[in-house]
Amino acid sequence: MEEYTHQADKFVFHVRKDLLYSRDEVWVKAEGDHVRVGVTDFAQRRGGDIVFAEISKKGTHVKRGEPLGSYETVKVVQDILSPVDGVITEINPIIDSKPEIINKDPYESGWLAVMKSESGVEGLLSAEEYFELMKVKVAEELKKIRGM
């Protein structure tokens, strides 16, 4: 897959060009009237090693901007905010027993859920738009780390 890459210090961040993105660090792959979602490479790197992930049950209705699940790292528990209005129709069975797959392969085998979208993908960012936003977020994180 084609992607944008951004290097900052020792970190390299990847943004897939074939996906859409929310400002809340969730990627979206349109699949007809459904969307497959997962956390971005930036989100999983910022949080560190994921030790636990939980997604709401199949059949749960979630509004855009509301939590559809969460993940836990050694540093933080992070809500995963839904990028669309919709109903969860499928949950990645791997993440229950191997949540670290989200760190290893966030855009493929580390996907989180499939949702039947009720709101479409309007308002989501293109890969190019998200890449520019992510670069700003990376710079902000590096400033925090360096204490500037």
Residues of each region from the PLM?
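Acidic, glycine-anchored pre-beta loop/turn
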Residues: 54-63, 86
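A structural signal for short beta-strand/turn segments enriched in small hydrophobics and glycine
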Residues: 59-71, 115
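Non-catalytic terminal segments and appended small domains
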Residues: 1-58, 91-148
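Short coil-to-beta-strand transition motifs
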Residues: 19-22, 79-87
